[in-house]
């Protein structure tokens, strides 16, 4: 495969959906739509305790700031945000990029409806339902792909990686953050025994080495 795509920015931290798996993921995010933002942004004491206990106090607000910092404030190309989720972290940044063309995709209509409430009034942003494993986009048509807190939900991650690579222009950037298996036994237990069974996470999950190997086969430069 070609290696022209320039760089991948990784901060530690759909895809051929069919049958029961698709329903499971859809239902999981429908039931969590009212608490999703609260958990990620740690708006209340319960979400703060959950993050501290199971995610080693990871601050998603800080991670989001670091991820979005890789997108220049004067960015004017084509940008793909997948999955967009509720756009709780990206609303301000995407709204400010008036000269860009931004496509926000999510498989979950419940997540997408909330994103549309935040972003729908901006002419340079479109929010559409879609499958990252089968992106309805031309080859080499996107300058930057951002994937924030979403890869863990993709059951066919191999297709997701390939589709993102396919739509990126040579020299384009893939900016993402991932759940990485093997960093915390407590987190791994939570993911395996609760989050995956409920449909919020979908195996397989990569270790840092496995993820690095995947990316280095696709991209000329990886920054982990």
Which role fits each region the language model picked out?
Residues 133-144:
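A short acidic, Gly/Pro-enriched loop at the edge of an enzyme's catalytic core
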Residues 72-73, 139, 161:
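A short, aliphatic-rich alpha-helical micro-motif
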Residues 78-134:
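Class I SAM-dependent methyltransferase SAM/SAH-binding core
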Residues 1-5:
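Cys/His-rich short segments
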Residues 8-73, 88-92, 111-114:
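Conserved class I S-adenosyl-L-methionine
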Residues 175-224:
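C-terminal alpha-helical "lid/dimerization" subdomain adjacent to the S-adenosyl-L-methionine
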Residues 144-156:
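A short SAM/SAH-binding and catalytic strip from SAM-dependent methyltransferases
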Residues 158-170:
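A short glycine-rich, Lys/Arg-flanked "PGG" loop and its adjoining helix->strand segment in the class I
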